[in-house]
Amino acid sequence: MKVIMTTKVDKASMNIMQKLIENFGFKETELKFDGNPVYKKDDMVILTTNDEMIYYDYLDREIEKQLSFKPEIIAFASRHSSKQKLPALTTHVTGNWGEAMYGGKDESFAIAIPSAMKLALLKMNELNDLGWTVCYEATHHGPSELEVPSFFIEIGSSEEEWVNDRAGEIIAETIVYVLDNYENSKFKVALGIGGGHYAPKQTKRALNSDLAFGHILPKYAQPVSRDVILKAINRFHEKVEAIYVDWKGSKGETRQLAKSLAQELGLEFIKD
């Protein structure tokens, strides 16, 4: 089963859920998760919780405990908040390059699924008739303690956008498309290094080439140790083939570390 995760405390999440039910034929079942109705269509279920999803470590175990199945993948339908209030449609994997400020554990990562995130980016970009930004975000916040692949897909960045009907429709359609197609998609998988939080160069590369990013280490989280980068590389569902560096958007020691790791691991080194 493929899981679409939502929460009652998030207006964007509820907007996306409503559009999934209205437009894509999800039907209420007799099952409950965290006390809320479970909706199902084919091999997909919508689950709803009552608190912020970023703190839901071990969600996969909880699903197994309550519903007796292990998810193949979890798509978290969520809001994105930023001070700039940039209208945006974003996707990213979760985890913490350093201290865990917002869920998850320190220096710990969820399992990235680059093919799903790339398909999400491409589909959001294709459907985006709002004129909003479509982008990756760097790896940040929780949950980090999940043993199945997952990704967040978000509407940003203020209440006005969270409740926007068209944004809800775009994300709902994107999620269904991604869950239907990610298993049959083959891209060149890369760890991304450098740039700001919205990973502009990685986003551009993913939209215009066969590169698909999983974990992305932004400049503001640098430097990190070799061990932390290796930890992130080991938390990809698909085999990492390249390390990509936004050269100007990275600190000197991180550039060199990325270069030597690529050599050591036999990965392609892409300098942009």
From Swiss-Prot:
This is D-aminoacyl-tRNA deacylase. Monomer. GO terms for biological process: D-amino acid catabolic process. Belongs to the DtdA deacylase family. It catalyses: a D-aminoacyl-tRNA + H2O = a tRNA + a D-alpha-amino acid + H(+); glycyl-tRNA(Ala) + H2O = tRNA(Ala) + glycine + H(+); D-tyrosyl-tRNA(Tyr) + H2O = D-tyrosine + tRNA(Tyr). Changing E154A: Reduces deacylase activity. The keyword Hydrolase applies. D-aminoacyl-tRNA deacylase with broad substrate specificity. By recycling D-aminoacyl-tRNA to D-amino acids and free tRNA molecules, this enzyme counteracts the toxicity associated with the formation of D-aminoacyl-tRNA entities in vivo. Catalyzes the hydrolysis of D-tyrosyl-tRNA(Tyr) and D-aspartyl-tRNA(Asp). Its cofactor is Zn(2+). One of its GO terms (molecular function) is D-tyrosyl-tRNA(Tyr) deacylase activity. Thermostable. Binds 2 Zn(2+) ions per subunit. It is an enzyme of class 3 (hydrolase). The keyword Zinc applies. InterPro entries: Deacylase_DtdA_archaea, DtdA. Its EC number is 3.1.1.96. Keywords: Hydrolase, Metal-binding, Zinc. Pfam families: tRNA_deacylase.
